[in-house]
């Protein structure tokens, strides 16, 4: 978390994902799915980077065991650079509600069974952040992006692997010299 993270990475595609706040139940459940399949992500030649609008100190208790880079951006500079928004629809969109309930139950289970910390009651940066995903080439081009419409609207690992494969196939196709 306190290391330098290169984006773009000269040797790999980068999946740059923007999450909400440290301890966000929806974000943490989502990131756990990426951690569980991290070997597949690495084998696909991807570097995983998750950005939160919280400080590194606030993130540590929730993300220290993740096998990929987590970046704190409490000033939301990267959010502004990539046009990632905050809006009430993050929580008010009915499509988010099932994911919110599922992630809160998962968080409570982790608190009881694994001693994980509770989410903050007043999170740094607020609760209304929207997720976003970017697939970035080694030359810095954005190959694919997705701006979530609510808190639980983001790429899955399967989406990411499919997009990375498609990007590689597109790059590998011979260019016409007409």
Whereabouts are the PLM-identified features?
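Short active-site neighborhood of thiol/selenol oxidoreductases, capturing the structured segment around
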Residues: 6-36, 48
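Structural microenvironment flanking redox-active thiols in thiol-disulfide oxidoreductases
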Residues: 30-81
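Short beta-strand/turn micro-motifs composed of small residues
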Residues: 19, 52, 137
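Thiol/selenol-based redox catalytic cores and closely related redox-interacting motifs
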Residues: 69-152
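A short loop-to-beta-strand scaffold at the N-terminal edge of the catalytic core in hydrolase folds
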Residues: 1-5
């Amino acid at each position: 978390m306190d290391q330098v993270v290169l984006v773009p990475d000269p040797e790999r595609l980068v999946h740059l994902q923007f999450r909400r706040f440290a301890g966000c139940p929806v974000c943490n459940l989502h990131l756990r799915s990426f951690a569980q399949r991290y070997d597949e992500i690495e084998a696909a030649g991807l570097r995983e980077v998750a950005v939160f609008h919280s400080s590194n100190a606030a993130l540590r208790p929730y993300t220290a065991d993740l096998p990929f880079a987590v970046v704190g951006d409490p000033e939301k500079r990267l959010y502004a650079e990539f046009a990632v928004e905050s809006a009430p629809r993050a929580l008010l969109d009915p499509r988010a509600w099932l994911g919110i309930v599922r992630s809160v139950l998962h968080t409570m289970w982790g608190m009881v069974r694994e001693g994980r910390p509770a989410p903050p009651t007043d999170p740094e940066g607020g609760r209304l952040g929207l997720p976003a995903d970017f697939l970035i080439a080694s030359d810095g081009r954005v190959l694919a992006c997705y701006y979530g419409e609510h808190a639980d609207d983001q790429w899955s690992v399967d989406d990411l692997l499919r997009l990375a494969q498609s990007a590689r196939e597109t790059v590998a196709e011979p260019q016409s010299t007409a």
